[in-house]
C-alpha cells in the first residue's frame, strides 16, 4: 500500500507542480505590484471589519474558519518532516511559498466571493463555483467538486488524526484507539451543527491556540537568542546548497519546502475560498486581502516558530534521498510531532511535551472540521443539480470513519494519502485561477480606486464586465453596510477614475 501511494505521489508532486506553484505565485505578485506587501496594514484592518448576517459570517469568523484549515498538523509535524527530508533549507522554501502564495490566496478567495451563491440560507462558494460561472466549463467544475469531496472527506483527515493520536500517546500514554473514539464523538457534535456552529467554534479556538503556541515558541527562541543568527544562516545556506552537509539534497529542500508549504498554508490548493466565500462583505477584494494575510499567519508565524525551535535546539534529523543519515540530533523518534515535543520539553521540562500535544490537538481537530465544511460546500454545489440530501449525511459518516482509520494507521500512509489529496486539488485549482486571474485583478483595481477616494468600496460586476456574478446583481440584501447611508449607486457613480495607490 505504501509503495502504491508513494508512486502516485511521485506523479502528482512532480517538479512541474512545484514550479507551477512558485511560478504562478511570482507572476501574480508582479501582476498585482506585490499586493502582499503594499496592503499589509489594510489587510489587518479588514480582518476586524464587518459583522455576521443571517446568511453569512463576519470577516473575522471567515478568517478563523480558513485558519482552522490552514493551521493544522502541517505547522508542527509538517515542518518536522520537511526538515527531515529536505534539510533546514526546506524552511526557507516554505517561506517563499507563503510570500508568493499570498497572491495566489488573494486571487482564489476574491474569485470565491465574486461567484458565490446563497444556498439554503447560507453563502457558499469555491473553485467549483468560479470554474462553472467564470470559465463556463461545468464538467471541470464537477471534477473539482468530486475530487475535493474525496480528498477532504477521505484522504486528508487521516493526517490530522494520526498526529493527534501520536502526540497524545507520547505525552499522556493514551491508546490511539481511545483517541479515535474520542475524536469521532467530538466531530459528530460539531459537524451536525451546521456552518454557524463551525464558525463559532473556530472563532473561539483558533486565535487563542495559535497565539499561545507562538508565544511559547518565542520564549524558547528568546532563551536561545544567541543561536538565532547561526540558525538563519544555516537555513539560507541549506536552501541553496551552500551548506556542505546538505548540499546534496538541494532539490529535496525545494520539493519538501513547497509541498509542506502548500499543505500547511493551502495557498493555490483551492480550499481557502470555501470559507472566505461565507463572509458577508461589500466587495470581494476585502476577503481576498484578509485571506492573503492568513497565509502569513500560518507559515511566517506558526511554521517559523516550529522550525526555529527545532533548529535552535538541534533536536531533529536529516536524511538523504537514499535514506542515509546526514544529521542526527534526536535518536529513536519518528519524524513528526515527537520532534517538536522533545524540543520543547528539553527547554521547558514538565510542560513542553504536554503543551505541544494539547496545541496539536486543537490545531488538527479544527482542521478536520474545516475539511468537513469544504467537502460539504462541494456537495451543496452538486446538490443544486441532482438534489441528493443523503450525500451530506454520507460525508459525515465517511469523515468520521477516515478520522478513526487515520488515528490508528502508520504516519507514512496517512501523510501519503493526504499529499495525494492536496496535489490533485492544487493541479485543478491552479489551472483555473490562471485562466480567471484577470477578473480578480480588475476587482482589485476597482477596490483600490474606490478606497483611494475615501469610499467604502461596493462591488458592481456589470460595470467591471464580469458576468454570472448573480449574487451581487440581486441577492445581496442582508449585507451589513460599513457606512450606513452610503448607497451602492452613489459609490458606482463616484468610483470611476484612475487607480491612485
Model regions: which residues?
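N-terminal alpha-helical transmembrane segments of multi-pass membrane transport
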Residues: 1-73, 83-89, 434-501
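Helix-loop-helix module between adjacent transmembrane segments
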Residues: 24-29, 97-121, 127-191, 359-369, ...
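Extracellular/periplasmic helix-exit of transmembrane alpha-helices
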Residues: 29, 106-115, 120, 218-234, ...
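Membrane-interface loop-to-helix entry segments
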Residues: 20-44, 162-168, 174-236, 376, ...
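Alpha-helical membrane segments and immediately flanking helix-loop junctions
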Residues: 53-85, 111-114, 119-128, 132, ...
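Flexible loop linkers connecting adjacent transmembrane helices
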Residues: 34-59, 81-83, 87-91, 95, ...
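Transmembrane helix-loop junctions in multi-pass membrane proteins
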Residues: 31-36, 74-79, 88, 154-165, ...
Amino acid at each position: 500500500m505504501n509503495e502504491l501511494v508513494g508512486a502516485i505521489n511521485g506523479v502528482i508532486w512532480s517538479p512541474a507542480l512545484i514550479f507551477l506553484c512558485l511560478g504562478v505565485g511570482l507572476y501574480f505578485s508582479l501582476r498585482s505590484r506585490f499586493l502582499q506587501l503594499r496592503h499589509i496594514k489594510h489587510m489587518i484592518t479588514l480582518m476586524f471589519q464587518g459583522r455576521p448576517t443571517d446568511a453569512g459570517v463576519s470577516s473575522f469568523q471567515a478568517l478563523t474558519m480558513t485558519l482552522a484549515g490552514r493551521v493544522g498538523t502541517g505547522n508542527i509535524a509538517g515542518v518536522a518532516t520537511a526538515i527531515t527530508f529536505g534539510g533546514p533549507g526546506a524552511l526557507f522554501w516554505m517561506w517563499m511559498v507563503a510570500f508568493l502564495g499570498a497572491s495566489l490566496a488573494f486571487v482564489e478567495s476574491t474569485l470565491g466571493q465574486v461567484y458565490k451563491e446563497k444556498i439554503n440560507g447560507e453563502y457558499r462558494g469555491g473553485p467549483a463555483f468560479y470554474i462553472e460561472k467564470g470559465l463556463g466549463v461545468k464538467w471541470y467544475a464537477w471534477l473539482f467538486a468530486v475530487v475535493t469531496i474525496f480528498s477532504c472527506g477521505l484522504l486528508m483527515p487521516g493526517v490530522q488524526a494520526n498526529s493527534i493520536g501520536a502526540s497524545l500517546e507520547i505525552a499522556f500514554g493514551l491508546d490511539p484507539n481511545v483517541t479515535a473514539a474520542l475524536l469521532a464523538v467530538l466531530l459528530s457534535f460539531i459537524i451536525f451543527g451546521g456552518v454557524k456552529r463551525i464558525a463559532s467554534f473556530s472563532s473561539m479556538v483558533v486565535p487563542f491556540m495559535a497565539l499561545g503556541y507562538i508565544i511559547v515558541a518565542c520564549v524558547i527562541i528568546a532563551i536561545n537568542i544567541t543561536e538565532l543568527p547561526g540558525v538563519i544562516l544555516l537555513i539560507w545556506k541549506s536552501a541553496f546548497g551552500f551548506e556542505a552537509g546538505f548540499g546534496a539534497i538541494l532539490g529535496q529542500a525545494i520539493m519538501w519546502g513547497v509541498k509542506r508549504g502548500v499543505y500547511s498554508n493551502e495557498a493555490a490548493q483551492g480550499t481557502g475560498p470555501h470559507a472566505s466565500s461565507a463572509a458577508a462583505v461589500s466587495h470581494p477584494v476585502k476577503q481576498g486581502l484578509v485571506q492573503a494575510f492568513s497565509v502569513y499567519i500560518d507559515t511566517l508565524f506558526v511554521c517559523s516558530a516550529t522550525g526555529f525551535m527545532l533548529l535552535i535546539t538541534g533536536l531533529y534529523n536529516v536524511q538523504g534521498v537514499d535514506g542515509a543519515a546526514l544529521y542526527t540530533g534526536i535518536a529513536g523518534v519518528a519524524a513528526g510531532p515527537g520532534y517538536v515535543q522533545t524540543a520543547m520539553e528539553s527547554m521547558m521540562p514538565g510542560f513542553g511535551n504536554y503543551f505541544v500535544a494539547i496545541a496539536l490537538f486543537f490545531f488538527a481537530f479544527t482542521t478536520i472540521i474545516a475539511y468537513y465544511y469544504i467537502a460539504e460546500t462541494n456537495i451543496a454545489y452538486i446538490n443544486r443539480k441532482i438534489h441528493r440530501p443523503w450525500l451530506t449525511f454520507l460525508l459525515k459518516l465517511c469523515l468520521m470513519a477516515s478520522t478513526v482509520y487515520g488515528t490508528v494507521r502508520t504516519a507514512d500512509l496517512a501523510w501519503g494519502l493526504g499529499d495525494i489529496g492536496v496535489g490533485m486539488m492544487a493541479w485543478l485549482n491552479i489551472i483555473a485561477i490562471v485562466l480567471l486571474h484577470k477578473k480578480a485583478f480588475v476587482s482589485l483595481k476597482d477596490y483600490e480606486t474606490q478606497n483611494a477616494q475615501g469610499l467604502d468600496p461596493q462591488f458592481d460586476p456589470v460595470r467591471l464586465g464580469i458576468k454570472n456574478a448573480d449574487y451581487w446583481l440581486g441577492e445581496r440584501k442582508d449585507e451589513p453596510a460599513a457606512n450606513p447611508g452610503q448607497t451602492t449607486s452613489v459609490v458606482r457613480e463616484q468610483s470611476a477614475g484612475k487607480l491612485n495607490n
